[in-house]
């Protein structure tokens, strides 16, 4: 947490909603078990920290409850600090309902972990065996964050996982004098009734395979496992972007998107590829990158059947079929299918050549052009013809060479119908029809239609 967040936490004005990061189901499927455990541990740690320091929601609710009781002439009660914030609880419940959480398939191992944890429990309070999953998760979380005081926070959140969000109203309680008196818990009863009415409103919602209710978006019909996830989704329809970047002022609909964006300013790249060591700002980018090592290509074009390792690459490829060119140059009006191609094109206008050859000092506007050029120095010829075994430094030259074997002549003159195997051959031929002579001799001023003719002519002056 930042220093500003720490200060706000001390003042009791931070809620779990302010710091919670919620994944969509698509994003969640991209995480492996270790990453899911780390995410869960961080969320549980934040929840425990905020509830132990005093949630902003609880502060508002307690003030309202004290005011209500005072207006009715009732004595104020001291709310135990261990009470959980009822507004933040559903958010954590949504997180714990995500499928495939570590620990869901380890009930036997969970019991043994609970037993081990009980042996070291300084409070001496036994953990209930019917909370195997939650106990196991907290045990693992404690391993990930050794500084977290598990003994202090575990009972609170265990009660949360047993759905003790709205405690049953007690009819009687013992007074300090030892007498029994009727408890006036009307404020809590009203809250319980409110929760009950919300459940009735959602009774028509569809259910998951295990019987849990889903929350359905009234705009598009999409369903979600938790109300908080639904609230986040609905910002797609409303356009609401409540999270602002303090560095550039850009707004985002989710805190997770803001956190990803902030790394642009900080330069942080916390996700490292175990194969090649490359670093990424987002976990989804790392997952996409790792497919280059595994060879997985799950995204297939419905038009031509070509497969890609990344969804973004498929989206770019589809523009070949649709002809869409959404990126326009403000200087000359030319349009491009990809933003990267537009950025390369702009260097024609600016003259910027950021890629320099270390061997000869020649500069290039594109990195790919530099790589091709460097093969002049290294002699590398990675592209080999399967027909004759001849090798080439560039794939485009290999494609042109293959036409010798296939006899393909894809470039046809619109004037006379003559065909050529290379585009350069067609361009040279078209000069015959236009009469253009762009190649001029510096010595005598004679002009020629082809560069080769000029070179042959210049030998007359050099003789």
UniProtKB/Swiss-Prot annotation:
GO terms for biological process: regulation of DNA-templated transcription. Residues 174-191 have a biased composition (Basic and acidic residues). A zinc finger (C2H2-type) spans 215-237, 243-265, 271-293, 299-321, 327-349, 355-377, 383-405, 411-433, 439-461. Expressed in ovary and liver, and at lower levels in brain and muscle. Residues 14-89 form the KRAB domain. It comes from the Eukaryota. Keywords: DNA-binding, Metal-binding, Nucleus, Repeat, Repressor, Transcription, Transcription regulation, Zinc, Zinc-finger. GO terms for molecular function: DNA binding; zinc ion binding. Belongs to the krueppel C2H2-type zinc-finger protein family. This is Zinc finger protein interacting with ribonucleoprotein K. It comes from Mus musculus (Mouse).
């Amino acid at each position: 947490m930042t220093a500003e967040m720490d200060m706000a936490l001390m003042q009791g004005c931070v809620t779990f909603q302010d710091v919670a990061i919620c994944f969509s189901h698509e994003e969640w499927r991209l995480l492996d078990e270790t990453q899911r455990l780390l995410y869960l541990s961080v969320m549980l740690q934040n929840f425990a920290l905020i509830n132990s320091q005093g949630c902003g929601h609880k502060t508002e609710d307690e003030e309202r409850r004290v005011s209500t009781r005072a207006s009715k002439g009732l004595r104020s009660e001291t709310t135990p600090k261990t009470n959980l914030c009822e507004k933040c609880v559903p958010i954590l419940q949504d997180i714990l309902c995500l499928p495939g959480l570590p620990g869901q398939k380890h009930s036997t191992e969970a019991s043994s972990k609970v037993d081990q944890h009980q042996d070291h429990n300084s409070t001496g309070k036994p953990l209930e065996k019917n909370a195997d999953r939650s106990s196991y998760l907290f045990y693992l979380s404690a391993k990930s964050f050794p500084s977290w005081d598990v003994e202090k926070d575990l009972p609170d959140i265990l009660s949360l996982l047993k759905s003790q969000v709205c405690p049953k109203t007690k009819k009687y309680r013992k007074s300090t004098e030892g007498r029994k008196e009727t408890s006036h818990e009307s404020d809590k009863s009203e809250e319980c009734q409110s929760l009950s009415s919300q459940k009735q409103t959602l009774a028509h919602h569809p259910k998951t395979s295990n019987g849990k209710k889903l929350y359905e978006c009234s705009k598009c019909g999409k369903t979600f496992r938790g109300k908080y996830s639904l609230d986040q989704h609905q910002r797609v329809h409303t356009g609401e972007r409540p999270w602002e970047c303090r560095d550039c002022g850009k707004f985002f609909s989710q805190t997770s998107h803001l956190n990803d964006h902030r790394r642009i300013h900080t330069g942080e790249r916390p996700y490292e590829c175990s194969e090649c060591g490359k670093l990424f700002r987002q976990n989804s980018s790392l997952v996409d990158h790792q497919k280059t090592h595994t060879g997985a290509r799950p995204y297939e074009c419905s038009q031509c059947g070509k497969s890609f390792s990344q969804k973004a690459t498929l989206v770019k490829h589809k523009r070949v079929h649709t002809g869409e060119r959404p990126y326009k140059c403000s200087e000359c009006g030319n349009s491009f299918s990809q933003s990267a191609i537009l950025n390369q094109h702009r260097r024609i206008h600016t003259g910027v050549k950021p890629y320099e050859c270390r061997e000869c000092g020649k500069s290039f506007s594109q990195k790919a052009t530099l790589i091709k050029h460097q093969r002049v120095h290294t002699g590398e010829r990675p592209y080999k013809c399967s027909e004759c075994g001849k090798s080439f430094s560039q794939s485009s030259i290999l494609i042109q060479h293959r036409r010798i074997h296939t006899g393909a002549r894809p470039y046809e003159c619109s004037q006379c119908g003559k065909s050529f195997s290379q585009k350069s051959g067609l361009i040279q031929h078209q000069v015959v029809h236009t009469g253009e002579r762009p190649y001029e001799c510096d010595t005598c001023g004679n002009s020629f239609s082809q560069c080769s003719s000029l070179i042959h002519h210049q030998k007359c002056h050099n003789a």
